[in-house]
Amino acid sequence: MLKTTSIAAAAAVATAVSFGAVQAAELKLSHQWSTSDVRHKVAEIVANEVAAANVDLEIKIYPSKSLFKPREQYNPLTRGRLDMVVLPLSYAGGQQPAYNLTLMPGLVKNHDHWSRLVESPFMDKLEEIMAGDDVMVLVHGYLAGGFGGKDRCITGPDDVKGLQTRAAGKAFEQMLAAAGASITSMPSSEIYSAMQTGVLQAANTSSSSFVSYRLYEQLKCYTPAGDVALWFMYQPLLMNKTTFDNLSAEQQAALKAGAAKAQAYYLDEAKRADAASVEAFKKAGVEIASMSNDDFTAWREIAKTSSYKAFVEQTPGGQELLDLALSVE
């Protein structure tokens, strides 16, 4: 009798544990970067805040492309096979052409400008499109980039004429080609060797890539993101909307609180990355150039007849979206 009671008690405990395990939800979060990257830290802040809230919710982060390939993350997110992801939204521009506007020259002037842009009707419209794919934004964030010249400084459009140039993104390639550059496409990891062998004379990439790939060893001049910059890429933390809606009110509140903290960190760290890149290039003896407001305006005029024109032609409702983005001061 005692043995039977013990077995029954053990079964009851096992059932309780099992029930508890079911109640404590686990969310899978994927991204492509290392655990030292700012985008991993953003994910980690949200995960840690949710854990500290003690709301029976755990976020398991899969960094370094360990769950999905970078450009293959959006579809699983829309289908609920993946709960959360940090990614450049333009990676999903094939599925939703409107997303290509989040990697477009001259739409974002500086970091404070993007913090206004994400609170504008432009972002509301983008989020409507995401909602149609069962996707929502938890954390907004843009990262900036600059220009590097092998033999000379690049600030305005005239500076790239005749140069073999690598650009970060199709829209930037279109604009640079319109300015007279010859485009050489390659991942940022190949810029160093291309410059070393003379294949490349100029490049456009993110502030962090300029440093992590030690491009200061190849460049004569660096034009970083400063008071104005041409290259900004939207890289948010997204979540499957149905997954979020199915969470308890307490779990949703914990996620939102963590997201608010992460977004403030993201903005600060994005600015810090730009400043850190300048210090690295100065230390290496590379000349530092600045893009003026006149330079920015000149680039934007070229973008209007190249990148912007192509976007509007290829995107349903593209003109409305572009106008909304350009209206944010």
Language-model segments: what does each one mean?
Residues 1-9:
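Bacterial N-terminal signal peptides that target proteins for export
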Residues 9-12, 25-113, 119-329:
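N-terminal secretory/targeting leader peptides
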Residues 19-24:
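Sec/Tat signal peptide C-region and signal peptidase I cleavage site
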